[in-house]
Amino acid sequence: MAKRHIILATVLLTAVVTARAQSEWVNPFIGTSNHGACNPGAVTPNGLMSVSPFNVMGSEMNTWDKDSRWWSTPYVAENKYFTGYSHVNLSGVGCPDAAALLTMPTRGNLQVDYHIYGCEYTEEKASPGYYSNFLANGVKTEVSATTRTSIERFTFPAGPANILLNLGEGLTNESGAMVRRVSDTEIEGFKLLGTFCYNRNAVFPIYFVLRINKAADNDGYWKKQRPMTVEAAWDSDQGAYKLYDAYTDELAGDDIGYWFSYDNLAPGEQLTIQMGVSMVSIDNARENLDKEQSGFDFDKVRQAAEDKWNEHLCKVQVEGGTDDQKTVFYTALYHTLIHPCIINDVNGQYPMMEHGSRKGKKVGVVTSGERYSVFSLWDTCRNLHQLITLLYPEKQLDMVRSIVAMYEEWGWLPRWELFGRETFTMEGDPAIPVIVDSWYKGIRSFPVETAYQGMLKSATTAGRKNKIRPDIDPYNKLGYIPLGYFQADFSGDNSVTHALEYYVADAALARMAVALGKPDDAKRFRTRSLGYKNYYDKEYGTMRPRTQDGAFLTPFNPRQGENFEPVPGFHEGSAWNYTFYVPHDIEGLIDLMGGEKDFLNKLQMVFDEDLYDPANEPDIAYPYLFSRVKNEEWRTWKTVHSLLEKHYRNAPDGIPGNDDAGTMSAWAVFSMMGFYPDCPGDPYFTLTIPAFDKVTITMGNGKKLEIVKEAAANFALQAQSQAMSRACSARIGGKKVKSYRISNKELTEAGSIVWK
């Protein structure tokens, strides 16, 4: 008996010793290749501040360069030339912006041209809230972050050294900055960011305060001078970087920076810098830094960041599966917790939505909770906000409040908001399904009537003055939008895409009207949401654009538009990528296609002939639509399993394309847990076999949901015959499911889902 106790104790001790915190499963290098647009830098959950290695400029040894093409990420795995750390970076986004305020440690003589001071690097390490590398110039670099501040520790060999702040470069399309020396260890200033996704008016300043732990032997500004010719060429600094070592007032310009130089550091001496940022003012940036960091304690900040990540990631516990699957899962969950990000300062101030000044002020104040920004709603309305609602409802409440406040400040609900500016990127009216989904899932402590008025405004305002639905007139009159109304050039006219997004939004708006006791509105918008039928062409069996005379577009190729090829009527996809995108009325689409058999055959063909695009949003829910036909759920299980294995991997290219502010990662999280929200604004989930033997979810309501996969379910996934695949079934709360599409209430109150 004693021997048995010893063995049991040894087993338990081993289990404790070998247990890994969730953050240890995260690989921040996933998504840093294959246009994933993620970066491995330090960030805290939904933090404004992020610190990323910047390796996309300065050398021909780089595979990708920010100035040679449209490039939207500060870091790419294939590149090898490091030019500093960028601050406040976007994650998984397809348009370049931010990623500025570049800090760089160098050795030897002072150089301020990044083509010269940049260098190669090795020994990269990254974990949630931490990144480090070893530079070819002999410096070890480490960075970490809080919500609004960064800390960077540089360990130097003996000899002369420099710390640079480059305000001229970054991913933003804007130029212009200012920096001011405050003391021998502190500088302050701002840089202009913006022109995101071609929107010339989406421009905003970011304010900063930078401190260093040791006064420099020499410090000063730099600015690149304009090149001169003929008589004016007498200036020896013309066309070059000019050092201002005796100038102490503030300096402004386009290509400017600040430097701290040290004559002779001791071997292993560390220089540490901190930076606080704000979208409101320099004073707020300083207050953020004072409140979020005391002293220059790098290890304390790093540990706090790691602890914060573990608090968030532990909401989901998984057992079984491979180590790679666990890494893919927790990295995906990590990526869903980067955007939207907190934009208010520690004092509650935030930049009001553009044009908010018409009410007499530009700065708002939150008195409770947080104000959020970076709402890539065309993407995230499909799954990310549903995930936040399930696991972190207090965050989703603040996000909904932020969205509604933007309507109050600006007059419209946002579509793609960035740092207090509407960028008008992508299509549709996606704030509506986000708000409606949240309401139906119990998030209601926000001004719902105000939100409803915002929904009505974009859904009913006529003409071009409708900022969210500028082509609403034909949509109202005809039930669809013909080519040539939104844009004369058919190749850039996304009429079908626009309308399909409006149908989904209108269906959600109808649900909101039902909840608020407005039956006439509910009927009106539900009817309008069925206008997609005007686009269905039986000849091709797909959605097909119509011209202004009502005829179908001719000639027409339903496959045109693959790989982002321009195509009339559709944005970033072909007709096949959009044909099934009527998730609010799949039953109606089945009838339109001639019945369940034809529907299944067409949907299966999309996957069999590689017409499905796993790297973009329009068809992201397609795998789950098989389950709308009884006894065909097995197709969902096998298709989802196959897509996860093929496109989500523990490697830099382990996301199939742009992560789109966490949307692709949210697809993986839901799919690996075993359920998915297949219709924006509709509080339902479609079940699938999970990737793990057991998933334990601690939901925001405090309840737990256990999802268990028994051996028979694995067999069903691997089975070659339909009969064997169909043999598997799920039980919810001990009862066999009648439908594999269940309500949010059923899911959150189930207690258990067991696959047998």
Regions found by a protein language model. Give the residues of each.
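Bacterial Sec-dependent N-terminal signal peptides
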Residues: 1-22
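Surface-exposed interfaces of beta-sheet-rich extracellular modules
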Residues: 721-734
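Hydrophobic, small-residue-rich alpha-helical packing segments that form membrane-like cores
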Residues: 501-505
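Accessory carbohydrate-recognition regions in carbohydrate-active enzymes
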Residues: 22-381, 385, 389-433, 439-500, ...
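Low-complexity, intrinsically disordered or signal/transmembrane-proximal segments
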Residues: 5, 718-722
